[in-house]
């Protein structure tokens, strides 16, 4: 048996923060899960011990308490879908049937009054979530939330096809899949709701703003893969993970794959920091708040990842760090060799050109 991997402290230049009502929110989310009977009794019993309310409180440390609670319930609901149907349920091996279920759930999210799936706990929970999204968000934010949920569902069906076939995608396909099946993009509208504003399309749809949101998703999901590798590798079922993809594609040992994954996420973290700081200098107060929330999302996922029993697995402890470092292992400005995301680094050249255009030409004597 190969020696157990030890995850070193990961690079994080972002400060830790948490909502002061985190303990109350965690209790409320556990009660919400019981009220709507999310997942099987066994799964629900696990989810309510995983500090999901605390995770939400780390994502929105200064947000409206009602939205922090909404986000916590939504994250738990997502785990009810992912753990209950995709990862551990039979539908996770039947992509066609899984697509049918998820398509029906999307209809419930779009039109909660539709008389369908009325005895389904996940549908009931989703109806409650949709009503609360309507209460705290605008019509545009609600529409983007539903659209992002569809993206998430689409990606987990793709993953289910690999699970059924027992195949591992290449790194580019895995990266593209992971940007969505980590359910990070579906959280983004709630970052705005949590602070009572709506980022306007002229800023939200800018290439650079979209890119930093994708970078945040990459960092969060790569970190999740690093933290969950111990649990997933020790399990008996099929699993997809960045380390496994790197092992297969590049012929690496688990230790080498861990080093490669850390290098990749460090390089993206450095790029995220540079581009988000540039955007903050020229953006509206709403954009600056959005960028701050992306940072909180990244750091919140990190702090939750090294502390939740979901990943520390006390019965079979993982060798996880208890702190983070402010020194990256890789601060190169060269693009990652992943076509789906290599264009992110084009933003550095675009910013340099923008700076040159702003510098007045020197007149000759």
From Swiss-Prot:
Pathway: Secondary metabolite biosynthesis; terpenoid biosynthesis. Binds 3 Mg(2+) ions per subunit. The record marks 83, 159 as: Plays a critical role for substrate recognition. Mg(2+) 1 binds at residues 82, 87. NCBIfam families: selin_dien_syn. Substrate binds at residues 178, 231, 310-311. One of its GO terms (molecular function) is magnesium ion binding. Mg(2+) 3 binds at residues 224, 228, 232. The record marks 55, 79 as: Plays a critical role in the stabilization of intermediate cation. The keyword RNA-binding does not apply. Monomer. It catalyses: (2E,6E)-farnesyl diphosphate = selina-4(15),7(11)-diene + diphosphate. This is Selina-4(15),7(11)-diene synthase ((2E,6E)-farnesyl diphosphate cyclizing). InterPro entries: Isoprenoid_synthase_dom_sf (IPR008949), Selin_dien_syn (IPR048143), Terpene_cyclase-like_2 (IPR034686). GO terms for biological process: terpenoid biosynthetic process. It comes from the Bacteria. It is an enzyme of class 4 (lyase). Keywords: Lyase, Magnesium, Metal-binding. Its EC number is 4.2.3.181. The record marks 182 as: Plays a critical role for abstraction of the pyrophosphate group.
């Amino acid at each position: 048996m190969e020696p157990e991997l030890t995850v070193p402290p990961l690079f994080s230049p972002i400060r830790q923060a948490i909502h002061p009502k985190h303990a109350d929110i965690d209790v409320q989310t556990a009660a919400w899960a019981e009220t709507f009977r999310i997942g099987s009794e066994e799964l629900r019993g696990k989810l309510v011990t995983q500090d999901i309310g605390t995770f939400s409180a780390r994502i929105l440390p200064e947000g409206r308490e009602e939205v922090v609670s909404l986000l916590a319930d939504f994250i738990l609901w997502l785990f009810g879908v992912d753990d209950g149907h995709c990862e551990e349920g039979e539908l996770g091996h039947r992509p066609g049937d899984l697509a049918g279920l998820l398509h029906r759930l999307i209809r419930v999210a779009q039109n909660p009054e539709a008389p369908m799936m009325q005895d389904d706990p996940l549908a009931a929970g989703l109806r409650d979530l949709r009503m609360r999204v309507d209460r705290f968000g605008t019509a545009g934010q609600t529409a983007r939330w539903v659209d992002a949920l569809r993206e998430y569902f689409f990606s987990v069906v793709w993953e289910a096809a690999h699970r059924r076939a027992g195949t591992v995608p290449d790194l580019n396909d895995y990266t593209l899949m992971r940007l969505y099946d980590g359910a990070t993009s579906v959280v983004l509208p709630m970052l705005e709701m949590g602070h009572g504003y709506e980022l306007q399309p002229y800023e939200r749809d800018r290439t650079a703003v979209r890119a930093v949101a994708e970078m945040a998703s990459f960092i969060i999901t790569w970190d999740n893969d690093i933290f969950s590798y111990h649990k997933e590798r020790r399990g008996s079922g099929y699993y997809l993970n960045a380390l496994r993809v790197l092992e297969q594609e590049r012929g690496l040992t688990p230790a080498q794959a861990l080093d490669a994954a850390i290098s990749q996420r460090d390089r993206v973290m450095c790029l995220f920091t540079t581009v988000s700081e540039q955007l903050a200098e020229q953006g509206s107060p709403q954009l600056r708040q959005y960028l701050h929330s992306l940072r909180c999302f990244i750091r919140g996922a990190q702090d939750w990842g090294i502390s939740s029993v979901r990943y520390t697995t006390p019965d079979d402890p993982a060798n996880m760090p208890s702190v983070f470092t402010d020194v990256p292992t890789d601060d190169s400005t060269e693009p990652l060799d992943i076509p789906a995301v290599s264009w992110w680094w084009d933003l550095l050249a675009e910013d340099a050109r923008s700076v040159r255009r702003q510098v007045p030409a020197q007149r000759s004597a």
